[in-house]
């Protein structure tokens, strides 16, 4: 006896076949309801907005008061920031300072540009407030105090930081392939680290994803920096992470010691970022007299040139950089001086 299907049942069968539902369809089998993915309502998003506004723990501050204030307290998950500047102007210095200030966040720092020893030594120098060369020389001599401090910092305040250089990245990819994972390129490896590995190691996904720097994402299918930045941004957002991408501005003839604008990221995916910072070293401005350049030797310039938060406030600020590589926030220095003055009264 032939079982007749209603129009709705027939349409359901067709839909199941289209989505590749497993198993043969029997005429006698009742039509199964088709699963339809849900989408958030405006009320759902509004509830998250309210929670976001009242929760100060869900923001990743950079440690520069005026910029963090313009960002509403810092960067949030699913947001992407590009840090742009010419070669050797301090792009990584800014991020190192931010990481050193945020020990409670899981940070996956992928650095095909610099070896992990170099990155960690600079972070430790800031944490220990010592010149990187002094830290290295003391460790070389076997100074027990510095060795103890290095190990203590690394297993406590830096326990949530993972630094993955090119060698570690390649070894991880090979291990994935041996385990049967399909690895088509570096994005697949980074995706596994941000999700599967982080959840296994920490019980949750990474809070912050740093890639240093964009042009060293070696994937033949990503032919230029905008394509690379787009892929990295998509990856970070997919894992609900704060995404920070370092981008080296053109090696053109522009003044290395002058403030850079958003055009410094031209053709570098600046239109893809929610926020963009540019950095420079004022003492490299060749138009300044020699004595002025000498005075600016330890000055670090930073500007928030793209800001999609609130009213889009832009910020430009000069900061002092210490021998340890620490950036001194003028706002914090003013507060400290004010408190000292109050104590003297």
Where would I find each of the regions flagged by the language model?
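Short, solvent-exposed loop/turn segments at secondary-structure boundaries
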Residues: 220-224, 256-257
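The Walker A/P-loop phosphate-binding site
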Residues: 23-130
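Conserved inter-motif catalytic segment of the P-loop NTP-binding fold
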Residues: 13, 105-220
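Short, well-ordered beta-strand core segments
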Residues: 107, 243, 276-278
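A short beta-strand-to-loop transition that corresponds to the Sensor-1 phosphate-sensing loop
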Residues: 113-114, 212, 241, 245-250, ...
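Conserved, well-folded catalytic cores of nucleic-acid-processing
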Residues: 126-130, 213, 217, 235-238, ...
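C-terminal regions of RecA-like/P-loop NTPase motor modules
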Residues: 3-47, 152-159, 170-209, 234, ...
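Conserved Walker B catalytic segment
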Residues: 222-234
């Amino acid at each position: 006896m032939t079982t007749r299907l209603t129009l709705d049942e027939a349409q359901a069968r067709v839909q199941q076949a289209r989505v590749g539902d497993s198993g043969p369809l029997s005429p006698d089998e009742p039509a199964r309801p088709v699963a339809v993915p849900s989408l958030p309502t405006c009320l759902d998003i509004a509830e998250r907005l309210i929670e976001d506004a009242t929760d100060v723990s869900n923001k990743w501050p950079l440690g520069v008061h005026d910029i963090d204030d313009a960002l509403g307290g810092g960067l949030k998950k699913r947001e992407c920031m590009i840090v742009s500047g010419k070669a050797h102007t301090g792009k990584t210095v800014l991020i190192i300072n931010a990481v050193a200030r945020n020990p409670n966040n899981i940070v996956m720092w992928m650095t095909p540009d610099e070896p992990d020893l170099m990155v960690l030594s600079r972070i430790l120098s800031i944490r220990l407030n010592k010149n990187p060369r002094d830290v290295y020389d003391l460790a070389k001599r076997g100074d027990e105090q510095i060795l103890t401090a290095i190990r203590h910092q690394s297993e406590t305040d830096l326990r949530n930081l993972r630094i993955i250089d090119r060698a570690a990245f390649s070894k991880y990819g090979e291990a994935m392939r041996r385990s049967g994972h399909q690895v088509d390129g570096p994005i697949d490896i980074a995706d596994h680290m941000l999700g599967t590995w982080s959840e296994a190691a920490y019980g949750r996904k990474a809070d912050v994803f740093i890639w240093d720097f964009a042009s060293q994402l070696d994937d033949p299918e990503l032919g230029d920096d905008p394509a690379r930045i787009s892929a990295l941004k998509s990856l970070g957002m997919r894992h609900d992470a704060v995404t920070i991408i370092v981008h080296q501005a053109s090696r053109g003839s522009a003044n290395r010691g002058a403030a850079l604008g958003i055009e410094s990221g031209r053709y570098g995916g600046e239109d893809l970022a929610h926020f963009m910072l540019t950095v420079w070293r004022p003492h490299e401005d060749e138009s300044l007299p020699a004595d002025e350049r000498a005075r600016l030797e330890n000055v670090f310039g930073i500007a928030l040139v793209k800001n999609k938060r609130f009213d889009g406030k832009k910020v430009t600020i000069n900061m002092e950089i210490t021998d340890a590589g620490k950036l001194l926030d003028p706002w914090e220095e003013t507060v400290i001086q004010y408190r000292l003055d109050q104590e003297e009264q």
